[in-house]
């Protein structure tokens, strides 16, 4: 599994899930990000996350395919 560390911008408390998937480059577009979330392919802290705009915060771990994204 490929580990990616994502640091929230200073002053930001969260990033929407679909924005995170685009920002780290594991999906090609926002519509693709929405599709993989809606299909139940993304896990947040070990649980399937179906909310496209879920607020991802520091300490969360997102998993999709062979990627593990740790939020700082």
Regions found by a protein language model. Name each.
Residues 68-72:
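Short, Lys/Arg- and Gly-enriched loop/turn segments at beta-strand edges
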Residues 2-15:
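A detector for short, charged/polar N-terminal pre-domain segments
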């Amino acid at each position: 599994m490929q580990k990616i560390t994502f640091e929230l911008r200073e002053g930001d408390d969260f990033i929407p899930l679909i924005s995170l998937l685009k920002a780290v480059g594991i999906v090609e577009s926002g519509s693709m990000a929405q599709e993989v979330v809606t299909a139940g392919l993304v896990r947040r802290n070990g649980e399937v996350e179906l909310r496209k705009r879920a607020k991802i915060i520091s300490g969360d771990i997102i998993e999709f395919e062979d990627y593990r994204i740790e939020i700082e």
